Structures are given as C-alpha cells and as structure tokens.
Amino acid sequence: MEFSVRAAELTTLLESRITNFYTNFQVDEIGRVVSVGDGIARVYGLNEIQAGELVEFASGVKGIALNLENENVGIVVFGSDTSIKEGDLVKRTGSIVDVPAGKAMLGRVVDALGVPIDGRGALSDHERRRVEVKAPGIIERKSVHEPMQTGLKAVDSLVPIGRGQRELIIGDRQTGKTAIAIDTILNQKQMNSRATSESETLYCVYVAIGQKRSTVAQLVQILSEANALEYSILVAATASDPAPLQFLAPYSGCAMGEYFRDNGMHALIIYDDLSKQAVAYRQMSLLLRRPPGREAFPGDVFYLHSRLLERAAKRSDQTGAGSLTALPVIETQAGDVSAYIPTNVISITDGQICLETELFYRGIRPAINVGLSVSRVGSAAQLKAMKQVCGSLKLELAQYREVAAFAQFGSDLDAATQALLNRGARLTEVLKQPQYAPLPIEKQILVIYAAVNGFCDRMPLDKIAQYERDILSTIKQELLQSLKGGLTGERKIEPDAFLKEKALSLI
C-alpha cells in the first residue's frame, strides 16, 4: 500500500512541531575542589564568580567565595567540610548572600543565614535583603535627637542614648554587659505599650555570636516570659557553629534591622559580642593565607567593624525618618581597653559604657565606671526634665571619687569633704538597680531628683533601697507623669513635700 504525502500537510505538521518546541537552557558554571581542610575549600574553574557569592557543593553544603586568586578560588564552608572531597563539583548560585527580613521575623530565633532554628516551622510572608550593603550617605542622615530609653538609671541619666546612635558596652567577662543589653530590650515593652503610632515603636534584634547554646536558650526563655519576644528577633551563631557563620551573623542581623530603619520604623540591634566575630574572622583570614597584622588580626579588621556599625543611623525626614540604634558589646582582657579590637570599636562608636570587675564585686550593679563612660551624641536626645535633674550628678560623682581615694588615709576631714563623701555614697547607692527590673523614665527622674536634692543625705545607706520602693509605690500617677515636663519653680513644690515626708519616716 502506498501513502502519498502532500507537501502542504508536511509543512504544516513541521511548523506546528517547531512552534511547540520549547528549549529551556540552564547554564551552570561548574568548578572542582582542588583541596579542602579546616573549613576552607580551594576550587578551580569558577572564572566568573563574584566576591561574596554563595556556592553549593555536591553534598549540598553551601559556602561563600572570599579569596579570588589567579589559580583558584578560596571558599569558606558554612558547615562541616568532612562531606566535601577533592574533585567534587562546585556550582555557582549567582546570588550574593541574603537573608529574610520583615515583621514575619518577630518572635523568631534564626541562624546566621536566616533559617529558623526554634522549631516553629517556616517563616511566613517576608522579603529578602542582602547582608552586605552600603551604609546611608551623609545627605540621607539626620542628627540623633530622640531618646532610646534603657530603663537603667545609671545609663539614662549619665550616658543617655539616642535613636540612631552607636553606644559600645565594654568590660571584662562576667561584669554584666549582656544584662544591660537584655534590660534595654525588656524596657521597650513598656515604651512600646505607650506608643501611639508605628513610628514610636522600637523593635529589637539580638545577635548572639559565639555564645553557648544554653545561654541563648536561657535568653529566649527570659524574653518570652516577659512577653518581649513579640517585638524581638534573635540571630544565633553559637560556639559550635563554624567560624564563617559567626563572622556573618552580625551582618545578617543588621540587614533584618535595616528593614525597619528603611521603612520609617525604629530598631535596636545588639551585637553580643564583636570580639568573638573578630576572632572568627581572624581564623578565616589566616586559613585563607591572608597576611596577619597586629595581634595576628588581618589588616582589614577595622573595616570589618566600621562597615557594620556605620549602618546604624538616624534617617532624614525625606527618607522616612527611621532609625537603627546599635549596642555593640566588646569583651576586654583584664580591663585592657587599649588592646587592638577595643580601641578600634571605641573610635568607630559614638560613646561607650565601661563596666569594671572591681565595682561589680563591690555590689555596685550595673558596674558602670562613670568617669570612663561617655555618650558623645546622646545628650541631644535626653529628656529635658532628666537633663535638669542630673545636671550636677556627674560632677558630684566625679568629686566623690576623687575625695574617696584620699579619705581612706585621713580621718580628720572638714565638714565640706564629709558632706561630699556622704552625698557621693548615697548617689552611688541610688544608681544601683537589680537585673531585669527596668524603670520608666518618670520614675528614674523622681528617684534621681530625690538623691541630688539631698532628701537621702541623713538616711542610713541600707534604707535607701526601701526609700526608693516607698516613693515609687505611693506617688500619685498624675504627679509622676507631670515630672516629664521638668522640675522647676512651682512644679517642684508638690514633689518636694512628698519626698520630704517619705524621707523623714526613714531617718
């Protein structure tokens, strides 16, 4: 049997086949592992790779390209390198490292790549942001002018912090650095409850770098019990995580905080602590065969921290008026603030809160050294009433410290010196505060006003804490709120009478 095929039919058939033929090309640039060890893989063949690009190994482990050399690419591995062998294929992803950001992150605990580790499932609606971005320029910024209350009397009165500021918390191990940071997060609970709009709310990001997992779990428990997780994000790169993740975690947390800053909201980010990030970066740099410098840190360790902390800023009204406040933590060795990393970060930040072991063991907690602690821009953001009340506080404490050193040797002191010692001891007592008990600003104003104006001068030192509790529990709410307006002229009459009456009962 013969089949006759007409040319027109054949043409139509071929045309329809060609029209419906889709080819979906996917071009992958593939490299091969030349050597691997100590969390570093040398890869040959990735000629077009970008610095900081994410790559994927055949085993599924990811890494980031940091060294682009003539012969090969130095890649730091996010995870265990035991599953990577010489000759394995490595694929470019084409994307620079990014993390999820947005309000969906609030209340969650994530790792340095933004993957949830709290066992509460995947993240809901969110956007993705690059971890490394340029800091806002000069024109996009505005001077710091809004207060960021920590709830700690010693900080809010003597070293006030403003929204958009970078204030370093520095001290030896076990001096209460993390306690100040946590108290600041807890204090935002009452501040946010008073907020009338989204622009007044302050969201918190806590980045734990190189800490024990048990410590991070304890922190999560403290925040959840205080209902503070609802406005907080926790980024954890624990001690058991690879060095690249500890290096990356602060940038990831910063990208999450920048979401709020760039959308007209306010955020606070705590880096606890940047000493461990510098150590992780030193480890990576030495393994990548980069030349070491002072204390074996690489030459760009200053840039490591400056590019991170410059991203904390107060935005101008034209760019949304949002802010990102940074509280970096640095651990010193035996109180040496002149070491390499501490001096670097002190020079980058807008002030520092210095904590001392000696004060901590003497029971002065928070153990803030008032003489060394400073806030370079915060006073512009301090409440007017607080500024009036604590104007003489720093001077009196400085004079007290000076005289107290000599008073140990001589017993025959004149009346003025004895009065100064007496007042200084009481001011020091008033600035003490238990952990996880932040005070609203109006209560701080009342307590400091009482101490500065001599209501505690004739009172035994052990009665001062009781006096503080008494006045805070019995003062009328209207009178307390009126303190924010300042304590001058006629406004002083009612508080003075109230404080005097309470003081007389304890003398």
Swiss-Prot record:
Binding site for ATP: G171, D172, R173, Q174, T175, G176, K177, T178
Disulfide feature: none
GO MF entry, a single one: ADP binding
Compartment(s): Mitochondrion; Mitochondrion inner membrane
Family annotation (PROSITE patterns): ATPASE_ALPHA_BETA (PS00152)
Segments crossing the lipid bilayer: none
InterPro entries found in the cross-reference section: ATP_synth_asu-like_sf (IPR023366), ATP_synth_asu_C (IPR000793), ATP_synth_asu_C_sf (IPR038376), ATP_synth_F1_a_nt-bd_dom (IPR033732), ATP_synth_F1_asu (IPR005294), ATPase_a/bsu_AS (IPR020003), ATPase_F1/V1/A1_a/bsu_N (IPR004100), ATPase_F1/V1/A1_a/bsu_N_sf (IPR036121)
Subunit structure: F-type ATPases have 2 components, CF(1) - the catalytic core - and CF(0) - the membrane proton channel. CF(1) has five subunits: alpha(3), beta(3), gamma(1), delta(1), epsilon(1). CF(0) has three main subunits: a, b and c.
Functional summary from the UniProt entry: Mitochondrial membrane ATP synthase (F(1)F(0) ATP synthase or Complex V) produces ATP from ADP in the presence of a proton gradient across the membrane which is generated by electron transport complexes of the respiratory chain. F-type ATPases consist of two structural domains, F(1) - containing the extramembraneous catalytic core, and F(0) - containing the membrane proton channel, linked together by a central stalk and a peripheral stalk. During catalysis, ATP synthesis in the catalytic domain of F(1) is coupled via a rotary mechanism of the central stalk subunits to proton translocation.
Family: Belongs to the ATPase alpha/beta chains family.
Name of this chain's protein: ATP synthase subunit alpha, mitochondrial
Gene: ATPA
